[in-house]
Amino acid sequence: MYFLKKIVNLFSSKIESEDNNVKKDDLTQPRKQSPEARKRRNRRIIFWLIILLIIGTIIGVIIYFSVRKEYDNVIVKSAQTEVVNNKKVLYLNTIRPNSTQITRYTIDEDQLLTARVNILNNTNFQIISNASSLGLSRISFNIVREGVEKFKLGETNIYAPISGNTNNQWNWLTSIITQNAGIPSSGFNPQVIISPLISIIFFIIFLYIILRVSKAQSDSLLGTNKANAKLTKSGVRFSDVAGIAEVKEELIEIVDFLKEPKKYVAAGARIPKGVMLYGPPGTGKTLIAKAVAGEANVPFFQTTGSSFEDTFVGVGARRVRELFEKARKSAPAIIFIDEIDSVAKKRGNSLTAVQDQTINQLLSELDGFDTSSGVIVMAATNRLDTLDDAILRPGRFDRQISVNLPDILEREQILRIHSRNKNLSAKVSLEDIARRTAGFSGAQLENVLNEAALLSVRDKATSIHMNHLDEAIDRVIAGPSRPNKVISEREREQVSYHEAGHALIGLYSPGADVVQKITIVARGRAAGYTLQTPERNENILQNKTELISRVRTALGGRAAEELIYGPNEITTGAANDFYKITNIVRAMVASFGMTDVGLTQYIATEGVDNPYRNSYSEQTALAIDIEIEKIIQREYKIVKEMINEHREELELIVQTLLELETILKPQIDYIHQYKQLPPEVIANKNKREASQKQANSSVEEAKVVDDEESIKDKEKDQKSN
């Protein structure tokens, strides 16, 4: 029992160490098992030990009875025959090795024939009979076949009567017994103990492997063995992040706490347990979290909200627990959950309670943090309005930091950071690039420089020039160009009028963005596009005049097509324009309260649980639709009037586009200011007309020569006739 108790304690400590990972008197460690759980675990261990002992005993018994007996070789001292009661008897005087004991064995003539027959048939000879009438002791031999002409002699009570005199057989058996004789061993056979022990050991190993494999398969089926967080050491610093100075200021305090937590604990300060970063995609939320971990030089656990969920119920909550346990052991550390809205949306909207379980576990872990644990949770989302209110309350994600799209100065700083390892030409102006990339995120700006570098390599240039950056911006906005796309001259002209209509309205609408570029080069699914950027720094708020200007600019393309080609020749090129127009006007009517429908917000701009569920009546929906259509038709009429009023300028823009295919702001401003074609367009047009005139004159000269030769040929024919 003492030995069994020791084994139980050994297994208990092993399992407890695996369950609890480490034992420390630390509040950040998981709780110890309850006494009831410990008793249940000990009972399971004792049960399996008893099962193993029973199985080992059964295997040992089977091996004991299946192992052939060992025989000690005996040395035959003499072998002689005598006649006793008219029977021949063989006397064997033998001695064991390493022993002086002499044993006398007897065998009579009656055994010989049967023994001979059984030996030849490869069978054991064992026939019991009564030989007391011979006056001999009840001793005979069991001859067991060991191999060709080799036999062992063992003790049995065997006699075999036989009739007749068989001297030849007698002599044969005498020689065989003399050459090979043996009796059962009286020593200890170690196989009786060793074999069961070996069997038990192999069985335990086999059982361990089976349990491990089955557990791995079960975990794989449940998806619980999938790593849900990457532990890394971040090498990013705040100097690697540009354009978010106010965000850095908010996070410096977090970095200081991770470096010197005792200072804040001693002062009784409660550092925010969670930091929520929200903003548009590509603004650098993940990069900021890495910079915080890099500045504080602490482990960085990175995961996504979707990695917590799986097919089976309870897996998400388990992964949340495991992630926070790992972070506690590595404290001070940072947990970063990207796209947290996929796991922490408002509760009650999901079809099942699986997601609610994960949210509840996440809330519990955030509340369970000790203020001195040294673990900071950072999360990122593009939709703060969809998150559960309990996530954002003080004590969980206390600090909510907005990471917006960079303005022109911040874009220039981002471009400078990403151009550190780029060989830019001295003529490249990053300020100009920043001005032309309004609305670009940090990720898009990095992509612009990378595309420009690839284009420079393709052109075998030693540095990145402005034309490479122009093409890179176009690629990011509309995709790569399609120079090999076959387009008719009429379609090319109609695309020019469409884009010129956008640009013309942008030039004359108050509050409209500045027209930076117009192109009719096909890119992606677009036959052309017009690039506009804000005249001033980007504003967070937009007024009604600016929204109306965006609507008019988008309507300019269709209006120009209809005025030039008629209502029956309009194209599908305005589909995306109408999509933008409808969204802007619908927001003005139903969200911003900018029309006669009223100041009520019928369509929420944030926290929409179900976008297909209306919170207003059918009459209100009809009023909204009527107001939207009224505004669009009113603005469309104004746009057509503006195009008719500035028809001459529209034609100049179209001629320039047909000549150059892509025109930039200086050329657009020249046309708008002087109402004439830019000098380079005139020069290019004159050059093309001159080359065409020269080609036509060459054709005329060739035609004259051909006519003269034909006249001469006719004259020759007439003379010959």
From Swiss-Prot:
Residues 700-721 have a biased composition (Basic and acidic residues). Residues 686-721 are annotated as: Disordered. The active site is at E499. GO terms for biological process: protein catabolic process; proteolysis. The keyword Transmembrane applies. Keywords: ATP-binding, Cell membrane, Hydrolase, Membrane, Metal-binding, Metalloprotease, Nucleotide-binding, Protease, Transmembrane, Transmembrane helix, Zinc. SMART domains: AAA. Residues 1-44, 212-721 are cytoplasmic. Homohexamer. Acts as a processive, ATP-dependent zinc metallopeptidase for both cytoplasmic and membrane proteins. Plays a role in the quality control of integral membrane proteins. This is ATP-dependent zinc metalloprotease FtsH. The lineage of its organism: Bacteria, Bacillati, Mycoplasmatota, Mycoplasmoidales, Mycoplasmoidaceae.
